[in-house]
UniProtKB/Swiss-Prot annotation:
The lineage of its organism: Bacteria, Pseudomonadati, Pseudomonadota, Betaproteobacteria, Burkholderiales. It comes from the Bacteria. It is an enzyme of class 1 (oxidoreductase). It catalyses: 2 a quinone + NADH + H(+) = 2 a 1,4-benzosemiquinone + NAD(+); N,N-dimethyl-1,4-phenylenediamine + anthranilate + 2 NAD(+) = 2-(4-dimethylaminophenyl)diazenylbenzoate + 2 NADH + 2 H(+). Belongs to the azoreductase type 1 family. HAMAP family: Azoreductase_type1. This is FMN-dependent NADH:quinone oxidoreductase. Keywords: Flavoprotein, FMN, NAD, Oxidoreductase. Its EC number is 1.6.5.-, 1.7.1.17. Quinone reductase that provides resistance to thiol-specific stress caused by electrophilic quinones. Also exhibits azoreductase activity. Catalyzes the reductive cleavage of the azo bond in aromatic azo compounds to the corresponding amines. Homodimer. Binds 1 FMN per subunit. GO terms for molecular function: electron transfer activity; FMN binding; oxidoreductase activity, acting on NAD(P)H as acceptor; oxidoreductase activity, acting on NAD(P)H, quinone or similar compound as acceptor.
Length: 198
C-alpha cells in the first residue's frame, strides 16, 4: 500500500495557495493509488522550535548519556524521520517567502538533518539515507522567479533533499500570484495543468 506524506509549510492557516495546490496534488496521487494512506504534517499547527543549545545538545549527546529532556527532543526528531522513511511519496507545499522557504520548513529540515540518521559521511563523500522515494514540491510565488537569480528556493530545495537521498524531485510552480487577477488565474491554471499530468 502506498503511503503519501504531505508537508504543509505555509505561514497562513487558511487560503495558502501552496497548501491548496498540494492538497490537489495529493488527491491526484490518490486517484492513481487506490487505498493509499495519506499523512499530513502541518508545520504551522505543529510548529518546531528553531535550533538552539537544547536541541543541538540533544542531537549530539550519545544516547546513553541523554537527559529526559534530551530524549524527548530526539524522540520528536525520530518521529519526523520515521514519517519520511515510511512514506513512498512526499508532497511539500512550499511557498516562496523573501526568495526562500518559510521558516517553518527550514526548522523542519533542521530537525530531520542528522548525521547517521538521514545522511552519513563516507570516504566517497556524503550519502543520503532517505532513498527510493518520489518527492514533489509545490511552490506558490507572488512574482516570477523560475530560472532567475531571485529563485534561491529551487536550488536550496534540490540540494537539501538530494543531500538526504531524495533525488527524484518534481517541482510544480504557481508563479505571479501577486501580479494581478489575470496573472494569478494563469498561474493557478498552469500549476493545475502540471498536477493533472502527474
Amino acid at each position: 500500500m502506498t503511503t503519501i506524506l504531505q508537508i504543509n509549510s505555509a505561514a497562513r492557516s487558511q487560503g495558502a495557495q501552496s497548501t491548496l495546490l498540494a492538497d490537489e496534488l495529493t488527491a491526484k496521487l490518490q486517484q492513481g493509488n487506490p487505498g493509499a494512506t495519506v499523512k499530513v504534517r502541518n508545520l504551522l499547527a505543529d510548529a518546531l522550535p528553531h535550533l538552539d543549545d537544547a536541541v543541538l545538545g540533544a542531537f549530539f549527546t550519545p544516547a546513553d548519556q541523554r537527559s529526559a529532556e534530551q530524549n524527548a527532543i530526539v524522540a520528536k526528531s525520530d518521529e519526523l524521520v520515521d514519517e519520511l522513511r515510511s512514506a513512498d511519496v512526499i508532497v511539500i507545499g512550499a511557498p516562496m517567502y523573501n526568495f526562500g522557504v518559510s521558516s517553518q520548513l527550514k526548522a523542519y529540515f533542521d530537525w530531520i538533518a542528522r548525521a547517521g540518521v538521514t545522511f552519513r559521511y563516507t570516504s566517497e563523500g556524503p550519502e543520503g539515507l532517505i532513498k527510493g522515494k518520489k518527492a514533489y514540491v509545490v511552490s506558490a510565488r507572488g512574482g516570477k522567479h523560475v530560472g532567475m537569480p531571485t529563485d534561491s528556493q529551487t536550488p536550496f530545495l534540490k540540494t537539501f533533499l538530494g543531500f538526504i537521498g531524495l533525488t527524484d524531485v518534481t517541482f510544480v510552480y504557481a508563479e505571479g500570484l501577486a501580479l494581478g487577477p489575470d496573472a494569478a488565474t494563469e498561474a493557478l491554471a498552469s500549476a493545475r495543468e502540471a498536477i493533472a499530468a502527474v
